[in-house]
A protein has these predicted regions:
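Domain-edge interaction signal
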Residues: 1-170
Length: 170
């Protein structure tokens, strides 16, 4: 993932930004699984797929003053929020990341998705990538997360994961 790609993702969210590091990680993972060429390496973490690449580029852009990071331990608010700074938004409005344009609708909808659905759905998709079997992926993800695979929210997360895979064929 490069700066332009992260800025484009944040541009799609408008003034709302992205609420939380976990949400950012899951949205990037799911976009990449849908075929968006973000080139991030992901490992399985307690909260699902995690990429040091995403964390580093985000920290780098905050340090460079390109994006606004609100929240964190120093503010007493443990969840971070990321938004483009006005000058970055203005610069970005004059250029576009062509490769990402076709993922705008999906990216925008993912940033608004329920956080648990993103977390479990991305974990299911992570396991699906290893076995190419939805039943096994759901079972392994739910075992990993210690939740019931027959639960309504688990099945909704499975549908989210399947929807992401179906995007690759489009």
């Amino acid at each position: 993932m490069n700066r332009l790609q992260l800025a484009t993702l944040l541009f799609w969210t408008g003034d709302d930004g992205i609420q939380g590091r976990k949400r950012l990680q899951k949205v990037v993972f799911l976009l990449q699984q849908a075929g968006c060429q973000l080139e991030c390496q992901f490992t399985l973490h307690h909260f699902g797929p995690y990429s040091r690449d995403v964390a580093d580029i985000c920290d780098e852009m905050v340090a460079a003053g390109l994006i606004q990071e609100d929240g964190g331990p120093q503010t007493g608010v443990m969840q971070y929020k990321y938004q483009l700074k006005p000058q970055t938004r203005e610069m970005l409005s004059q250029i576009s990341e062509e490769q990402m344009t076709k993922f705008q609708k999906l990216g925008t909808s993912l940033t608004k998705e329920n956080l648990w659905s993103l977390e479990l759905g991305s974990t299911i998709l992570y396991f699906y990538g290893q076995a190419n079997n939805w039943t096994d992926a759901l079972s392994k993800a739910c075992d990993f997360k210690r939740v019931d695979s027959a639960d309504k929210k688990s099945l909704e997360a499975l549908e989210l994961a399947k929807r992401i895979v179906s995007q690759v064929a489009i």
